[in-house]
Amino acid sequence: MLEICLKLVGCKSKKGLSSSSSCYLEEALQRPVASDFEPQGLSEAARWNSKENLLAGPSENDPNLFVALYDFVASGDNTLSITKGEKLRVLGYNHNGEWCEAQTKNGQGWVPSNYITPVNSLEKHSWYHGPVSRNAAEYLLSSGINGSFLVRESESSPGQRSISLRYEGRVYHYRINTASDGKLYVSSESRFNTLAELVHHHSTVADGLITTLHYPAPKRNKPTIYGVSPNYDKWEMERTDITMKHKLGGGQYGEVYEGVWKKYSLTVAVKTLKEDTMEVEEFLKEAAVMKEIKHPNLVQLLGVCTREPPFYIITEFMTYGNLLDYLRECNRQEVSAVVLLYMATQISSAMEYLEKKNFIHRDLAARNCLVGENHLVKVADFGLSRLMTGDTYTAHAGAKFPIKWTAPESLAYNKFSIKSDVWAFGVLLWEIATYGMSPYPGIDLSQVYELLEKDYRMERPEGCPEKVYELMRACWQWNPSDRPSFAEIHQAFETMFQESSISDEVEKELGKRGTRGGAGSMLQAPELPTKTRTCRRAAEQKDAPDTPELLHTKGLGESDALDSEPAVSPLLPRKERGPPDGSLNEDERLLPRDRKTNLFSALIKKKKKMAPTPPKRSSSFREMDGQPDRRGASEDDSRELCNGPPALTSDAAEPTKSPKASNGAGVPNGAFREPGNSGFRSPHMWKKSSTLTGSRLAAAEEESGMSSSKRFLRSCSASCMPHGARDTEWRSVTLPRDLPSAGKQFDSSTFGGHKSEKPALPRKRTSESRSEQVAKSTAMPPPRLVKKNEEAAEEGFKDTESSPGSSPPSLTPKLLRRQVTASPSSGLSHKEEATKGSASGMGTPATAEPAPPSNKVGLSKASSEEMRVRRHKHSSESPGRDKGRLAKLKPAPPPPPACTGKAGKPAQSPSQEAGEAGGPTKTKCTSLAMDAVNTDPTKAGPPGEGLRKPVPPSVPKPQSTAKPPGTPTSPVSTPSTAPAPSPLAGDQQPSSAAFIPLISTRVSLRKTRQPPERIASGTITKGVVLDSTEALCLAISRNSEQMASHSAVLEAGKNLYTFCVSYVDSIQQMRNKFAFREAINKLESNLRELQICPATASSGPAATQDFSKLLSSVKEISDIVRR
């Protein structure tokens, strides 16, 4: 019996038994060898002998002698069956080296080259796995026991080998070093000539390792066979060779079926082309792409049937289907963080290969990755893939792409590159980390671009390690050149957890969350959606873990990938979620979605400063440079704030005022954390996330103001904003349901209309362009253009400037009147006063602030008196219409007139109210708005700021938080009131004075532009826009470079701008709409520069240069319209 056991373990005599071999001997005596009920790994380990092949026989030096690594069954075409461990002699290779002709004792034939290895190579050892990533090694050992190990070569550093050893639930990695004399060692005291000797030594004694090497990890996955035949380029197959079985799903051009290749008894996937489709060329291009790519993590093409329709593409069959469904339905105990990271690593490896081959995928998403045995993942669906001949590929007009996975530059310009695939990989990584959640939950497809434009990014998923989230954020850099390459991403996965394991990191993250849960704020702040109802749903998905049907908001009911994804995603109960917020009872958590109007408000109050920054729904830059707390900010600071960095307030910038700014109270892009905890991302990532606002950091000062805002009014279109104007970015979270009607509803410079008409920006704008957008008006371009002039010289006083150009005439008085209730910047006492006023429903008039005296900044007393005359005259004309609202609204300072909308319509759009006001009233309100710009900033700062923020979404939010349902919301949330503007007054005096001439110009311009203000989007046709472009080109050609040329060109440009803004909603295709918005934005920028030109440039060449830019933008508009 002893002799049998000695033979079993490969020892010649008892003396040859090592301590390790003794262990195997005892196991062999107690159990049968390779019994059927034992796991494969243990049965192999029981037979494994560390001294195997330590001494090479004389025949093993033959270079043509190979050994089989896997079993292979012959299936025609002169192939040869081989069994694992069998020796064979190689006679030659086919044209591409993927098949070799071999001879064994059983005969001669073709075998796959990657199924055999030279008899004297390392691959013959069961413990040597070749090039394997660190993450893959941890995955391969995840089901092992103490002493399970493997030896691998680094994927990123060829030639560098390591030992990966599992012990007590963790995998340890030891680098194998090479001494100067060529010997190998892990511990410098023990050096060896060969790797096999080193492994044998450490199988007997630990000698620096955590434990001895006992059980080699099995090689689970056979390599992919590239092509089922050694014959040259044999892709065309006989249709009769395929037996079609059941349908697996639908693809872009047809359907996918499971089939059997009868010739080889091989299960395959068959993609068919719909007979009535005209996409034959695209379908065949997909097959051509697949012929060129061969990688273990890319789905392999087996053949095509293209002689006659229906056309087939036959690929290898992946057992577990697409990754998206697999993640949603898997056992999360089995598919742990280690497995998820392993999957992500495989995908990055495949994309690195495509990157090197100059291919782009263009549709990278979880739904287009397939899962096989042992969590093998392969990238599939190359229907949109292209071989890159240049740096970018421009898709044809009308091409469809999955918006939520598509990079911004691709949405705006139809241009794709490998960097746009990197963006999609970041979204795919988010899908993996959330077990298949739909990206941007609760956010409409039409809103995604605008959110991204404002640097909004998805929050970090629960339990996601910081390093993984940093990688996601790196993939989501706005500028494509700032994104990493797939080679860098793959390398990052390789080195991401050198000092720890992902399991430890995930447990640490979940532990942090659990600690927060004990403190009552364990909930991760929900994604900020863009609509009132979806905002409430987003809150529910955090508050109701026991109601998975509430998890996905709008994202579940929409087709996120256009035609590529089913319209309805499966419900996803989330795995790791803290208990519901203790402040909400069970009934509240289970309320129907439409009833839960104020849930998010309670969440914000509960978490105070930890609520995530919502995506602003106004113009990308409209409110950014108007942060209320940046009253002392310099012009450079304002520019930095406009260009993407966090919108930190002056308080946040000073640790003494807001220590939380540095210890973790800030919230980057929707992810929330507790004060005192380390941030989710490293400091360098903070610069990339501009959705961290001062309103979050300064929320403590406003707690008293929030005390009366337990619930939001459902009538308010922006129900996600906490009380107080300091929450500037909360104001524009929501959009109207009906996007086409949004433009009509909020037609004049209001958030809704302007947002739907706002040009998309594929690139981040400069600070000036953001400043320009602050008060942009869709219906009154001329005033907005002048507004730019004003802002150019008043950068230092942005917080208190008004924006008549962007304020609807009938909205202007409301802005002035509301200034008292929403000027948190003016001090805590002022905020408390405002809070009391709004909490009481504004039933009684509050003490109005003294009327601002004559303008110290540059207006004469006469002009100031004229202001008052116009105001009183205007208020005398409109009291009858606004009588109902005046009874409820908190009175404004004396100067503001009573030009407001009807009472009881809190969500009414400003443009609608403007329509009710009538022509004369509008003109007077406009005049008032212009005059208000020039009031003394030190004394009329609040009124000025009331004009400064005309964006309606922001408008109703603050006030509605504390008002009873019947109280109308006044669209003024003067967020940027300058309570202490005295330091800036000196700087502003000359700048405002310099713009006195432009004020009068603005008045006349506004009067002339009154009709366009009421233009409905449906009345502007394609022909009107084209005629307007021709008129502008004609004006440019007829005019010389003299000063007089500007007025004519400017007028034609403003007409074109007005028509374009009204026409944008008529464009049905999303891609063209994005491009058209960008073109409108360029046009406006050029017009603004042109208007400034007479005052700032006297040289002809400057004007010529402006004209050339203007012509370029006009041509772009014309091209898009003709498209």
From Swiss-Prot:
Its main location: cytoplasm. Residues 127-217 form the SH2 domain. Changing T315I: Loss of inhibition by imatinib. Loss of inhibition by GNF-2. Transmembrane segments: none annotated. A motif (Nuclear localization signal 2) lies at residues 708-714. Mg(2+) and Mn(2+) were both present in the kinase buffer but Mg(2+) is likely to be the in vivo cofactor. Residues 537-557, 586-597, 620-640, 754-773, 787-801, 875-885 have a biased composition (Basic and acidic residues). GO terms for molecular function: actin filament binding; ATP binding; bubble DNA binding; delta-catenin binding; enzyme activator activity; ephrin receptor binding; four-way junction DNA binding; kinase activity. Stabilized in the inactive form by an association between the SH3 domain and the SH2-TK linker region, interactions of the N-terminal cap, and contributions from an N-terminal myristoyl group and phospholipids. Activated by autophosphorylation as well as by SRC-family kinase-mediated phosphorylation. Activated by RIN1 binding to the SH2 and SH3 domains. Also stimulated by cell death inducers and DNA-damage. Phosphatidylinositol 4,5-bisphosphate (PIP2), a highly abundant phosphoinositide known to regulate cytoskeletal and membrane proteins, also inhibits the tyrosine kinase activity. Widely expressed. Keywords: Acetylation, Apoptosis, ATP-binding, Autophagy, Cell adhesion, Chromosomal rearrangement, Cytoplasm, Cytoskeleton, DNA damage, DNA repair, DNA-binding, Endocytosis, Kinase, Lipoprotein, Magnesium, Manganese, Metal-binding, Mitochondrion, Myristate, Nucleotide-binding, Nucleus, Phosphoprotein, Proto-oncogene, SH2 domain, SH3 domain, Transferase, Tyrosine-protein kinase, Ubl conjugation. Residues 1-60 are annotated as: CAP. SMART domains: FABD, SH2, SH3, TyrKc. CDD domains: PTKc_Abl, SH2_ABL, SH3_Abl. Belongs to the protein kinase superfamily. Tyr protein kinase family. ABL subfamily. Interacts with INPPL1/SHIP2. Interacts with SORBS1 following insulin stimulation. Found in a trimolecular complex containing CDK5 and CABLES1. Interacts with CABLES1 and PSTPIP1. Interacts with ZDHHC16. Interacts with the 14-3-3 proteins, YWHAB, YWHAE, YWHAG, YWHAH, SFN and YWHAZ; the interaction with 14-3-3 proteins requires phosphorylation on Thr-734 and sequesters ABL1 into the cytoplasm. Interacts (via SH3 domain) with CASP9; the interaction is direct and increases in the response of cells to genotoxic stress and ABL1/c-Abl activation. This is Tyrosine-protein kinase ABL1. It comes from Mus musculus. The gene is Abl1.
